[in-house]
Amino acid sequence: MQAGILAAAGIIVRIIGILYRSPLVAIIGDEGNGYYSTAYTIYTIILLISTNGIPSAVSKIVAGLMAKKQYRNAHKILMGAFCYVFVAGGLASAFCFLFADSIVGKSSAMVLKVFTPTIFFSGLLGVFRGYFQAHGSMIQTSFSQIMEQIVNALVSIGAAVLFMSFVKDADTSTQAVYGAMGSAVGTGAGVLTALLFMAAVYGVNNKMFRRRRERDRTREDLSYGQVFKMIFTMVTPVILSTCIYNMSSATNLEIYCSIVEKLKGYTEAQATTFYGLYSGKANPITNIPIAFATAMSSAIIPTISGSFEKGDREGTKKKVGDAVKTTMLISIPAAVGMAVLAKPVVFVLYPQQGTLDMVAGLLRILAISVVFYGLSTLTNGVLQGTGYVNRPVIHAAIALGIQTMVLALLLVFTPLDIYALSVAAVCYSFCMCIMNGLCIRKKLGYKQEVVRTFIIPMVSALGMGVVAFFVYQGLNFVFVTMKLLEKGTLNWGLNCICLIFAVLVAVVVYFALVIKLGGVNREEMIALPKGRTLVRIAEKIHLLQK
C-alpha cells in the first residue's frame, strides 16, 4: 500500500515534469535546454556526493531502531542526520558556486551557480523524508514530492520568461542562458516549498514523537559518537552507490562533448544542444516508469530491513519477489509502449519538428533500458535493506567502466554520435541488473520465479504493442481518408487523439492478456497503484471472477 502511494506520487511527479518541460523548451529553445541539462547533470552529481544518500540511510537506521522500540535513539539519528547535512550541504553548495566555471563551460556555469542553494535545501528535505519513510508512512513524502514539482513547474516557466525579458535585445545564445537560469530558480523554489511543508508536518507530529521517547525503556542510549559512526557507515556506501550509479550521466556528458568537439568538429553550442535532446527530452520520458521502481526501492528498504533484523528470511524473500514482480508488470509494457509509440509520444510533448525524428530514435533505444533500470534500482534497495550496502557500489563501478568503454568506442568508430548515449545507457543498466541479481541469489539464497514475473508480462506486452501500433496507424489512415490530415504530415491535435486512443486500448489489451495468461491474481492486482479499481474493472468485463 505504502509503496503504491509513493509509486503513484513518483509517476505523477514525472508526468508533471514532462508536461512542463514542453512549454519550457518552447520558451528557452533547444540551446537553453542544453545549458540547463548540462548544469543539472553536474548539480545532480554534487547533490549525490553531499547529501543524497541521507534519505535511504535515515530510513534504514531509524526503521531498525523503531523495530526494537528504541525511540530515543531514533531521534538521535534524526538530529545527527541534520548536523551531517548542515555541514555536507553547506560545503557542497560553496564548492558548486566557487568552482562552477572550472567544472562546465561558461554558459552552463551561470546556470549551475543558480542551483547552489538548492543543494543545501535538498539535504534537509531528505532527512525529513527518510524519517517519515522509516515510520512506514509514505503519504507525507508523496505529497511533498507532488507539491515540489508543481511549484517547480510554475516557477520555472515564469522565471524563464522573466529572466529572458532582462536580455530581450541580446543575441539568442545569451537569451538561452538566461532562460536556463530561470528554469534553475524553479528547481530551488520547489525544493524549498517541500522542505517547509515537511518541517510543518514534523511540527504537527512532534508531540507524538516526544511521548514515544518519554515512554522508551531502552537501557542504553547511543552516544553522538556512535550516532555519527552509524550515519557515516550507512551513508558512505549509499552515496558511493548512488553517486556511481548516477555518475554515468556526468561521464557521458564529458566523453560525448570531448569526442564530438575534438574529433568531429562540433562547436560547444552544437554539442550542448544535441546532449540536451538526449538528457532533456528523451531521457525524462523513460523516468516515468522508472519512478515506480524508485518508489518501490524506497519503500522496500525499511520493510526488508525490519524483516531481516528479525531474522525472517522467508518473509524477506517474499517481499523481494512481490516487489520484483510488481515492478516488471509496470516496466515491461511501458518499455514496449515507448518503443512502438516513440514518435507520437515525443511529438505530443515536444512538437519541435526539426528534432522530432532524432529524439524519437533516442527514445526507442532508451525504452530497452526501462526494464533494466527498473530492476536494478529495485535490487539496489534490496541489497541495501539486507545489509549488503557495498555490493551496489562495486557493481555500479564495474558497470560504469564497461559503459564508458562502450560509449567511447561507439563515438570514435561508428557514426552513431548522439545515439551512442542511448546504447551506453542500455549497456550500463543491463550490467547493473545482472550483477545485482546474481548477488541477491548468492547472498540471500533467493531465486526469482521466471514465467509469471518475466515471460507472461513480456508476451502480453508484445501483443499489446502490436495492437497499439495498428490502432494508432489505423486512426491516422482514417484522418487522411477524411482529408483532415495530409499523408506524411503531423498535426498535434489529431496526433493526441490517435495516441490517447491507442494507449487506452493498449492498457486494456495488456491487462486482459496478463490476467488470462495467469500472470497476476486478485491479490497482486490490489497491490498495484489503483489496484482495487483495476480489480473492479476486471470483474465487470469478466476477466476475474467475483
Question: Model regions: which residues?
Answer:
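N-terminal membrane topogenesis motif
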Residues: 1-16, 72, 76, 217-245, ...
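Signature of the first transmembrane helix
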Residues: 1-56, 64, 93, 97, ...
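Alpha-helical transmembrane segments of multi-pass membrane transporters/permeases
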Residues: 6-9, 117, 128-162, 379-408, ...
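Interfacial/gating helices of multi-pass transporter permease domains
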Residues: 24-45, 107, 173-181, 229-234, ...
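Helix-loop junctions and terminal segments of transmembrane helices
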Residues: 52-67, 291-312
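Interfacial segments at transmembrane-helix termini and the short loops linking adjacent helices
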Residues: 101-115, 339-370, 484-490
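Membrane-interface helix-loop junctions in multi-pass transport and translocation proteins
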Residues: 139, 150-201, 390, 400-437, ...
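Membrane-proximal transmembrane or re-entrant/amphipathic helices at the cytosolic face
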Residues: 474-546
